[in-house]
Amino acid sequence: MKTILSNGITRRSLLKTTATAAMFAAVKTAFPSGAFAATAGPEVTGVKLGYIALTDSAALIIAKEKGLFEKHGLPDVEVTKQASWGATRDNLVLGGAANGIDGAHILSPMPYLMHTGKVTQNNVPVPMAILARLNCDGQAISVAKEYAGTGVQLDASKLKAAFEKKKADGGDVKVAMTFPGGTHDLWLRYWLAAGGIDPDKDVSTIVVPPPQMVANMKVGNMDAFCVGEPWNEQLVNQGVGFTAASTGELWKGHPEKALGLRADWVEKNPNAAKALMMAVMEAQMWCESTDNKDEMAAIVGKRQWFNVPVKDIIGRLKGDINYGNGRVVHGTDLSMKFWANGASYPFKSHDVWFMAENVRWGKLAPDTDIKALVNEVNREDIWRAAAADLGVAAADIPATTSRGKETFFDGKVFDPENPSAYLDSLSIRAAS
């Protein structure tokens, strides 16, 4: 805090000013990059947010539909559909004041890739902040029906021979994800690599917006894809392909989407940022309740939001998965989590994994200071402040910013304290 003293200042006022400065310095330490006024209301009445038609955007939609933004002093929040993750990025670069958006339902790695300028025009960094995780689990890897005979599920190696034959016959094997370096890209790459298929050498990776996945597979534009719901369920319902694996089978309880905002908006509006989080957290609690699943599916499926039939949303939302290959499970714990088991809290350890995987695939430099980067972007302090004001039970507030070591379906273990050891254990990765 900068303090300007006049020449006529008294010793008493100097001591008082010094004490005040010390107090604000302490607040600055407690809440890096912005402090929260204890009783002040939001600095603004609204914020422009974007979303993609994916079930994991539900908290933003429910907060709008149920008046939760208004409840917390933000009656003018706008929640607008984005055509693709690329459009989300471009509108975040513009910012709300320039007819873009201030924040968004976003793939968890994207704020980091924007913050470092890796995915922005001319590589110009756009400082970003992650305030919360919007969900865990609830994505899937689906495959064209022509590969049903391979019996592929978690073990992607069953596709290896079929892919090699297609290439030998002059075909191109295409696998689709939604944004380079995003969660779907990373799940697809991890799954393929664990099965001995190099995603950079053995297949062609293409980018397709989530709502366009089913239509593109229907006309044979790709052999496999990774995307969130409801698009995998819709694929199966239309008989176009089948789900090989839910992403929760790759990494149970994995982090997925985030609530990301431009850092300048958060810095300028710390109380509004906290109020926004309070509304979103309440919506996440509502979405988590089993009693609300039918209503939730009906709301998000409406024309103004997803424009998707409820039947394409509700099954997997409730944990009932028809994989489309003869495998059907009911009441599985692989369903999307919005609040339970710390789903809303943005664990820094999870962001360390996302950054490590982006190093693995060459999106970030090997010498990236991952811990420093995560500390710049991850604003879990805002989540905690919002939780305190909401009266969230202590049991629902993580004691630390790390969930500890994580184990994947292939036996690999990720220690957030030593991402280099994890990377060294992986046999398939981009050339350094």
Segments predicted by a language model, with ranges:
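N-terminal secretory signal peptides
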Residues: 1-13, 20-22, 27-28, 36
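Stable alpha-helical elements in mature extracytoplasmic
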Residues: 56, 65, 88, 184-187, ...
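Short, glycine-/small- and polar/acidic-enriched structural segments
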Residues: 38-200, 204-207, 219-233, 240-253, ...
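Ligand-binding pocket segment of bilobal, Venus flytrap-like solute-binding proteins
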Residues: 101-103, 203-243, 262, 294, ...
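Secondary-structure end/capping motifs
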Residues: 269-381
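Conserved C-terminal helix/tail region of periplasmic/extracytoplasmic solute-binding proteins
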Residues: 352-432
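Short glycine- and hydrophobic/aromatic-rich loop-to-beta-strand nucleating segment
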Residues: 141-142, 258-261, 265-266
